[in-house]
């Protein structure tokens, strides 16, 4: 049995809420997780405006964007994405990592020589940002690459850097890793290969090390726990504001609202409802936190 298949076989669902602290307990931190915004021909302006409205109403402590802010990494798409992120930054800090669509596709020389030049000009020269406060550590991983059109890769250098970040962080911090590409091939999606070195990342971020891995790329929402309750939750957001939803989420847009508590964390899956013109909760789950070690 392959390691990948065994991980999927051992994945489990949410922990029963009755075994955790009261859902009414005020959260320590709140996050808004977005992905696959895709400014360009497939972008839905009304939906991205709804994202800003939700953020303004709920005031997260941090906004996390796991890549693909553009469709084809064109200058106009980056300018539109920058304006969108600027609106969010007026509400909360924003941490984002590139996706494969944020690397130029047809501008071959730029792709080979400066694949992240446009990203750095519009967002941050740091492609793998880190956010840290008294309650959480969020580490970005750039899985996009110049020499692959779709697939991703986790660089071993970054794995070593995250090892150091985790070792130096206080044990009680809630630990989050953000990457565009997925670590585990989801059931029934045979064409989507995990990022290179995903198996090594899973092993390094296993029980007692990381609480949550946030990703996108698949354009479907998904939750997997490769080590059961003792390990991290791999949480995928679908496409937040484009018409490129896939599979059962074709034509749908999603995001996640995350509340970090003392012994657990809550994940609200939101879907855009065109009739109401806003994001509404489609699923509300609570998961056990990693015990401090």
Predicted regions and their residues:
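N-terminal active-site segment of His-dependent metallophosphoesterases
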Residues: 2-86, 161
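Extended active-site neighborhood of metal-dependent phosphoesterases/phosphodiesterases
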Residues: 22, 79-161, 169, 204-206, ...
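Active-site neighborhood of phospho(di)ester-bond hydrolases with catalytic His/Asp-centered motifs
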Residues: 34-35, 63-68, 93-100, 142, ...
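Active-site environment of divalent metal-dependent phosphoester hydrolases
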Residues: 40-43, 71-75, 80, 98-108, ...
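Residues at alpha-helix caps and immediate loop-helix transition turns in enzyme cores, especially N-
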Residues: 43-47, 76-78, 108, 154, ...
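Short acidic, glycine-rich surface-loop motifs adjacent to enzyme active sites
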Residues: 171-188
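Conserved beta-sheet core of the metallophosphoesterase superfamily
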Residues: 190-262
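A short C-terminal boundary segment appended to hydrolase-like catalytic domains
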Residues: 260-293
């Amino acid at each position: 049995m392959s390691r990948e298949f065994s991980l999927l076989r051992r994945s489990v669902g949410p922990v029963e809420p009755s075994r955790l602290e009261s859902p009414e307990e005020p959260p320590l931190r709140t996050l808004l997780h977005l992905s696959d915004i895709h400014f360009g021909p497939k972008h839905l302006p009304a939906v991205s405006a709804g994202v800003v409205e939700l953020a303004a109403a709920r005031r997260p402590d941090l906004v996390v964007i796991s890549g693909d802010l553009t469709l084809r990494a064109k200058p106009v798409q980056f300018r539109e994405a920058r304006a969108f992120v600027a609106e969010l930054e007026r509400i909360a800090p924003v941490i984002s990592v590139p996706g494969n669509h944020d690397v130029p596709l047809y501008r071959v020389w730029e792709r080979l020589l400066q694949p992240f030049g446009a990203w750095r000009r519009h967002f941050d020269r740091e492609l793998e940002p880190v956010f840290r406060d008294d309650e959480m550590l969020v580490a970005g991983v750039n899985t996009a690459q110049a020499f692959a059109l779709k697939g991703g890769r986790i660089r071993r250098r970054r794995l070593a850097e995250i090892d150091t970040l985790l070792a130096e962080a206080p044990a009680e911090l809630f630990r989050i890793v953000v990457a565009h590409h997925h670590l585990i091939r989801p059931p029934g999606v045979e064409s989507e290969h995990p990022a290179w070195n995903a198996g090594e990342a899973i092993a390094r971020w296993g029980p007692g090390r990381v609480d949550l891995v946030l990703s996108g790329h698949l354009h479907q929402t998904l939750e997997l726990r490769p080590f059961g309750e003792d390990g991290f939750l791999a949480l995928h957001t679908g496409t937040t504001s484009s018409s490129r939803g896939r599979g059962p989420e074709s034509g749908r847009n999603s995001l996640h609202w995350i509340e970090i508590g003392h012994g657990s964390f809550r994940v609200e899956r939101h879907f855009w409802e065109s009739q109401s013109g806003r994001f509404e909760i489609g699923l509300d789950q609570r998961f056990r936190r990693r015990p401090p070690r």
